[in-house]
């Protein structure tokens, strides 16, 4: 009986546990009969990779505040891909890439790649494809279908925003096949063309960041942002000379950080900006939106929220007076590495060593040989990999007054390494300067030291052992590109269908050593002036001293917003060329104070009365009236230097018009024959707008040359008119050669006279020696 009761209890307990066990063991998925709808629903949420589709909005978007401001940006390949923007992906060079950044105070919530590409009609469908990577993560695959062959194809691919970082690289990899067996990767039928109108659609959302100066200059300048840095400057009213100097220092420092991106500094008087901005305020003069801020007892730099928008930040430069603001500005330019917290007090900025001429950080040093490692702008710049390695480029920013006329060449000591060719062939390294070929060197198949002592020809031909190589005259400008191309003769498979030879191609690797050097230390500084091209390309002659310590800027009394904007944009542009702020710039509003000064003069707004009658001025813009001098013969090309007779002023024309106009003129300083004056003039607010646009636009600056640049709605017209003067120093024999270089007939006459005189002297000397030898008693 007890045994029966035991079994009954055991069965009852087992039945009570069974339902809970069944609940835990139930499969997470639905039964097989319902699996197909579930998979379909999942496919709708996560589209199948490789599908050419319109893209899903908001997929994988990061979680951010819903009420934050956002902006939509379309980045075309024409903007962010290497020039010209389009890409031709081939069998031996299947990769192409674009790069873009993301500001640290923003996050991407949506991203979509829009492709416009044309595949070769010889490709095998489906087997050929385009793989898309973001930061080396595979985002998707676009297969080439039969209908797409030889036709322009439009496709979209969504990008997961979670993979987007501060710096991003989208890499396209072409996998192409044109036959099933015995393919040649170098076949000309293997290609896929990606159009320059392809692009990337991004939605950025702004983050509400803390007021913390330890991240400075973010958010006022973010190196991850490839756009022109537009940074308004806010004043209580027309600034005094001291405040003009302080704001110029800040603008030049931000210009030195902006570099190739460009910069723009809109000026506001007692207005609230609508974006991140710099505000200057003293205890007595401050914008109305800061009237309740407590007075300060020292130079203070503080980061605050915009009164109406917490997503916008203001950097307020406070001081008791303009002297404090000047000290605070120097603190921004030279002491920002110590910034932290919401505010800092600038106690002292003390210079320890004076700057030297031509020591701008962005310029190649001319006092000693420079290593290529010093010229690098990013890691891995001096190396390349691939079946056909991409070219290695080195930028050389030089002072525009470097005198190379009688130079025999520029010495380079190149140390390089490369993947050795398997056999001795015609693989080589080509060296070019400013897209002009210099020389090539064979790549040996033997292990040996690869070091070259090369002299870049500047104006003379290059002698290479057995052969005279004819080199066109190479003219170095302010910005130069030195390029190394490694050309490999890669063995490729071949054969027939029945007897096919195949193997896996191996990438080649090339490296230019960081210890390679180039030497510009043996050359003089000498340049004919006026030359607005030197100003437009390098900020010369003001940039000769990187801190602008030998520059005086003459401003109007009580300048308006447009005139202040011209000052800030000009010094910002010069800072971008030199890489150093204008901490020692002198600003004045009294034109009489420049008399007798040993300094280069920058005039903004209007030429002082004492200079208006100077015979060297070739353009004057004043209100609705303007006049200009035109030369006897005008040359349309900047590189052609006309004769003195062609430059002579033939006519002076005076006109009156209500249309806007601006101009830039250069002439010799009447107070020092080694100094120059450059004036930036405009006749109206629209004229200043065109002038600022020309200063900020590198393409428009490239059209400036000579002594006069007239800026109108139609564009910029430059003239070479008036006298030439020379700035710099040459030894007397170099100066004589320079003077005779443009007068070959006179040079030939002088050479003939010199030969005759030398022959006569030698003849007389030989007669004296002969007479003494024949008549020793007459000594």
Which residues does each PLM region occupy?
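C-terminal segment of classical bacterial N-terminal signal peptides
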Residues: 15-24
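Solvent-exposed alpha-helical segments and adjacent loops
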Residues: 26-779
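Hydrophobic helical h-region of N-terminal Sec-dependent signal peptides
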Residues: 9-15
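Bacterial N-terminal signal peptides that target proteins for export
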Residues: 1-9
């Amino acid at each position: 009986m007890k045994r029966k009761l035991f079994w009954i209890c055991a069965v009852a307990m087992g039945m009570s546990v069974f339902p809970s066990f069944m609940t835990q063991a139930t499969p997470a998925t639905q039964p097989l009969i319902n699996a197909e709808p579930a998979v379909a629903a999942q496919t709708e949420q996560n589209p199948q990779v490789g599908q050419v589709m319109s893209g899903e909005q908001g997929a994988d978007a990061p979680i951010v505040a819903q009420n934050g401001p956002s902006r939509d940006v379309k980045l075309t390949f024409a903007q962010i891909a290497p020039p010209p923007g389009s890409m031709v992906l081939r069998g031996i060079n299947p990769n192409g890439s674009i790069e873009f950044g993301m500001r640290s105070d923003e996050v991407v919530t949506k991203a979509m790649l829009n492709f416009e590409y044309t595949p070769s009609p010889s490709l095998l469908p489906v087997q050929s494809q385009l793989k898309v990577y973001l930061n080396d993560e595979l985002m998707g695959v676009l297969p080439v279908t039969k209908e797409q062959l030889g036709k322009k194809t439009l496709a979209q691919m969504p990008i997961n925003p979670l993979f987007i970082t501060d710096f991003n690289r989208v890499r396209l990899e072409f996998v192409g096949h044109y036959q099933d067996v015995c393919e040649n990767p170098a076949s000309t039928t293997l290609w896929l063309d990606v159009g320059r109108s392809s692009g990337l659609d991004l939605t950025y959302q702004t983050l509400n960041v803390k007021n913390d100066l330890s991240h400075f200059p973010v958010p006022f300048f973010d190196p991850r942002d490839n756009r022109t840095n537009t940074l308004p400057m806010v004043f209580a009213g027309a600034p005094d000379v001291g405040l003009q100097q302080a704001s110029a220092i800040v603008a030049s420092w931000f210009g030195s950080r902006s570099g190739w991106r460009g910069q723009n500094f809109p000026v506001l008087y007692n207005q609230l900006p609508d974006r991140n901005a710099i505000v200057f305020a003293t205890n007595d003069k401050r914008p109305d939106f800061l009237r309740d801020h407590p007075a300060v007892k020292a130079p203070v730099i503080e980061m605050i929220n915009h009164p109406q928008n917490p997503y916008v930040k203001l950097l307020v430069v406070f001081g008791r007076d303009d002297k404090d603001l000047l000290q605070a500005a120097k603190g921004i330019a030279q002491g920002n590495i110590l910034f932290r917290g919401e505010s800092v007090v600038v106690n002292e900025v003390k210079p320890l060593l004076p700057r030297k001429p031509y020591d701008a950080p962005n310029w190649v040093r001319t006092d000693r040989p420079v290593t290529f490692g010093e010229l690098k702008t990013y890691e891995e710049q001096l190396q390349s990999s691939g079946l056909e390695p991409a070219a290695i480029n080195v930028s050389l920013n030089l002072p525009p007054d470097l005198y190379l006329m009688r130079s025999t060449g520029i010495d380079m000591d190149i140390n390089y390494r490369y993947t050795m060719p398997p056999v001795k062939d015609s693989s080589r390294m080509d060296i070019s300067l400013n897209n002009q070929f210099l020389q090539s060197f064979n790549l040996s198949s033997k292990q040996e030291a690869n070091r070259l002592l090369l002299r870049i020809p500047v104006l003379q031909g290059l002698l290479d052992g057995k052969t005279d190589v004819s080199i066109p005259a190479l003219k170095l400008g302010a910005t130069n590109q030195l390029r190394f191309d490694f050309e490999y003769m890669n063995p490729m498979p071949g054969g027939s269908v029945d007897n096919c030879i195949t193997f896996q191609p191996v990438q080649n690797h090339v490296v230019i050593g960081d210890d390679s050097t180039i030497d510009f230390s043996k050359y003089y500084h000498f340049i004919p002036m006026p030359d607005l091209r030197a100003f437009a390309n390098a900020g010369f002659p003001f940039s000769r001293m990187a801190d602008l310590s030998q520059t005086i800027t003459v401003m109007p009394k009580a300048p308006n917003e447009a005139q202040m904007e011209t000052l800030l944009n000009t010094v910002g542009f010069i800072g971008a060329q030199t890489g150093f702020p204008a901490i020692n710039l002198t600003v004045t509003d009294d034109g009489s104070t420049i008399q007798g000064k040993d300094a280069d003069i920058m005039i903004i707004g209007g030429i002082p009365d004492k200079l208006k009658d100077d015979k060297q001025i070739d353009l004057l813009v004043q209100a609705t009236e303007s006049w200009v001098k035109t030369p006897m013969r005008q040359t349309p090309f900047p590189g052609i230097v006309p004769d003195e007779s062609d430059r002579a002023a033939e006519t002076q024309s005076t006109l009156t018009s209500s249309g806007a106009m601006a101009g830039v003129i250069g002439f010799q300083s009447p107070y020092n024959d080694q100094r120059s004056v450059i004036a930036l003039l405009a006749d109206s607010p629209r004229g200043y707008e065109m002038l600022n646009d020309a200063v900020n636009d590198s393409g428009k600056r490239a059209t400036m040359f000579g002594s006069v640049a007239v800026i109108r709605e139609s564009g910029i017209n430059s003239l070479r008119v008036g006298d030439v003067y020379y700035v710099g120093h040459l030894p007397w024999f170099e100066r004589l050669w320079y003077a005779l270089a443009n007068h070959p007939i006179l040079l030939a006459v002088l050479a003939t006279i010199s030969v005759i005189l030398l022959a006569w002297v030698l003849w007389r000397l030989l007669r004296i020696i002969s007479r003494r030898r024949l008549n020793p008693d007459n000594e």
